[in-house]
Regions:
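Active-site-adjacent beta->alpha loops and helix N-cap segments on the catalytic face
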Residues: 20-22, 46-58, 76-82, 102-135, ...
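Conserved N-terminal beta1-alpha1 strand-loop-helix module at the mouth
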Residues: 1-37
Length: 274
């Protein structure tokens, strides 16, 4: 995925609350010959699900490359290092490093020993052949950490780019962004990234997905961090006799428009479940 100049397509899956591992793998079977990789999420919304590394391992065995999402919310250093060693042992070497969704006030306890930046640094330590305490790793393997980003924050806050560049300098090999449905915003983001040489060796993948209705889009822009959907898009969906088909068309049109933008290397297609 990182050794190509081709436009990258990634997608994602969220393990279910189940003991049926086969069913989790079957959810992504249609992506095997289409996507470059699939993200496996790590207990999003702070809700317990089937272990993400177990699901990711089975998906990897099916022939589809995997990006393991890993949060610092639930695990201390020992647990995180164990997960990273486990991932490498089954051939998973791409890890999207996240702080993780935080629980409600009366929700489960969290650890938060590592945020996204700290996880990127931890990955680079592991890739260097040791644990954090200096213990040598037998049969060390390369690992490619990734960072998350929000386009709207980038184009509205002058210091946001410095924070992203810091993640690249720490060792992030790729960036996956939150949903964006606005070409002008992606273009501004592209132009801002292009002012920095830091992204020459980092793949930037824009998050998007087909909206099914205006109601869904309105909910997303009101409730999801970093998501801004224009009134024009919502009106187009609302006026459509087939809003799901219109949502797919909007997504496809946007992909075609951004493919030649500098510093934009692919799209991360997500299926909104709201």
């Amino acid at each position: 995925m990182f050794n190509t100049n081709d436009f990258i397509f990634t997608s994602e899956t969220t393990p279910d609350v189940t003991t049926d591992l086969t069913a989790c793998v079957q959810q992504v079977e249609d992506l095997i010959s289409v996507a470059d990789a699939v993200n496996v999420t790590d207990s999003p919304n702070c809700k317990s699900r089937l272990n993400s590394l177990l699901v990711a391992s089975e998906i990897k065995r099916s022939g589809l490359d995997v990006i393991l999402q890993l949060t610092g919310r639930d695990r201390n250093q020992i647990a995180l290092e164990s997960v990273l060693l486990g991932a490498l042992s089954v051939g998973i070497n791409k890890v999207l490093c996240l702080s993780g969704d935080q629980p409600d006030e009366n929700g489960p306890a969290v650890v938060n020993e590592f945020n996204g930046n700290g996880l990127i640094e931890l990955c680079k330590v592991i890739a260097g052949g040791t644990l954090s305490d200096g213990t040598a790793i037998k049969n060390p393997l390369p690992i490619y950490p990734g960072a998350a980003d929000d386009l709207y924050t980038q184009i509205s806050k002058p210091d946001a780019l410095d924070k992203l560049v810091t993640k690249i300098e720490q060792g992030a090999s790729f960036v996956q962004t939150q949903y964006c449905f606005d070409y002008d915003v992606i273009k501004q983001y592209s132009e801002k990234l292009n002012t920095q040489g830091s992204f020459e060796n980092c793949k930037v993948i824009i998050g998007m997905g087909p909206l099914k209705s205006a109601k869904q889009g309105d909910w997303m822009r009101k409730n999801l961090w970093g998501v801004n959907i224009s009134d024009a898009i919502l009106k187009r969906l609302e006026d459509s006799g087939s809003p799901a088909e219109t949502g797919e068309a909007i997504c496809q049109e946007l992909i075609e428009k951004i493919m030649d933008l500098p510093c934009i290397d692919g799209v991360h297609l997500m299926g909104p479940s709201c």
